[in-house]
């Protein structure tokens, strides 16, 4: 189980409304829910919550990629998540 796995650079930042902080907190929630769902495969409410959080994080990442590509690539590399795929 992953708890309090904030990246040190972003956790020291006091601006909790920033896009980076929100993406980090969503990523931590996603990792916790993923580890929970490995043990409880039939927990459909948690699966729904995971899908909602994934959508929120995807929208924030697309916003950040449009506004500031450098900050987006830094955040993606620090969190070790995949880049957005365009449809």
From Swiss-Prot:
Gene Ontology MF terms: structural constituent of ribosome
Record keywords: Chloroplast, Plastid, Ribonucleoprotein, Ribosomal protein
GO biological process terms, semicolon-separated: translation
CDD domains membership: Ribosomal_S15p_S13e
Primary location recorded for the protein, binned into one broad class: plastid
Oxidoreductase as UniProt keyword: no
Organism name: Oenothera glazioviana (Large-flowered evening primrose)
UniProt-listed InterPro entries: Ribosomal_uS15, Ribosomal_uS15_bac-type, uS15_NS1_RNA-bd_sf
GO cellular component terms attached to this protein's record: chloroplast; ribonucleoprotein complex; ribosome
Designated gene of the protein: rps15
Location(s), subcellular: Plastid, Chloroplast
Entry similarity comment: Belongs to the universal ribosomal protein uS15 family.
Name the record gives this protein: Small ribosomal subunit protein uS15c
Signal peptide positions on this chain: none
Transmembrane segments: none
Short name of any one Pfam family annotated for the protein: Ribosomal_S15
Organism taxonomic ancestry: Eukaryota, Viridiplantae, Streptophyta, Embryophyta, Tracheophyta
Self-association and partners: Part of the 30S ribosomal subunit.
């Amino acid at each position: 189980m992953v708890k309090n796995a904030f990246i040190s650079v972003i956790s020291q930042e006091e601006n909790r409304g920033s896009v980076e902080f929100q993406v980090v907190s969503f990523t931590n929630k996603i990792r916790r829910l993923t580890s929970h769902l490995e043990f409880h495969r039939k927990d459909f409410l948690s699966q729904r919550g995971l899908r909602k959080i994934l959508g929120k994080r995807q929208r924030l990442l697309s916003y950040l990629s449009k506004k500031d590509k450098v900050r987006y690539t830094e955040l993606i590399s620090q969190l070790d998540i995949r880049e957005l795929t365009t449809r």
